[in-house]
Regions:
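Nucleotidyltransferase catalytic core that binds NTPs
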Residues: 1-144
Length: 144
């Protein structure tokens, strides 16, 4: 995605939100990684020229209003959604490019996979621990 975006511009600025649950608790997920960890990952990407960190949607709007840029990249899922700064971009001649999401990766899906793997690991450990006890002792406690 960042590679494709970089091919469409000379200088790629990426906005990194500290925690989307600040403005939208219950709607967005809290990041599993710290803002520093996510920043370092973006910094390591050869397509990213600058990283702009923001906390709230108001901060994002202020970034949009004060930064110089000619194209804004959004995922196609936001095409018919009134996202922060969209109208400002339209009013000020900033092209909005909607990129296709050709993959199924999502932070929610990754969280669910990790949860299921950890759950299976815990269940396996419980079964291992139970197997060390005699069946009669187990039966005594299982009947209760």
């Amino acid at each position: 995605m960042l590679k494709m975006e970089k091919e469409l511009c000379d200088y790629l600025k990426v906005a990194l939100q500290v925690d989307p649950t600040i403005d939208r608790p219950g709607v967005k997920n809290k990041p599993a990684q710290s803002v520093y960890e996510r920043y370092v990952q973006l910094q390591a990407c050869k397509y990213v020229d600058e990283i702009l960190v923001y906390e709230t949607e108001l901060d994002l709007l202020n970034l949009i209003k004060t930064q110089t840029f000619h194209i804004r990249f959004l995922s196609e899922e936001y095409k018919d959604v009134d996202v922060t700064g969209k109208q400002y971009c339209i009013d000020h001649g900033v092209e909005i490019h909607y990129h296709l999401r050709r993959h199924t990766y999502s932070s929610t899906e990754i969280r669910n996979r990790v949860y299921e793997l950890e759950k299976a690991k815990r269940e396996e450990k419980i079964e291992e621990n139970l197997s060390q006890y005699s069946p009669k002792l187990l039966d005594k406690y299982m009947d209760k």
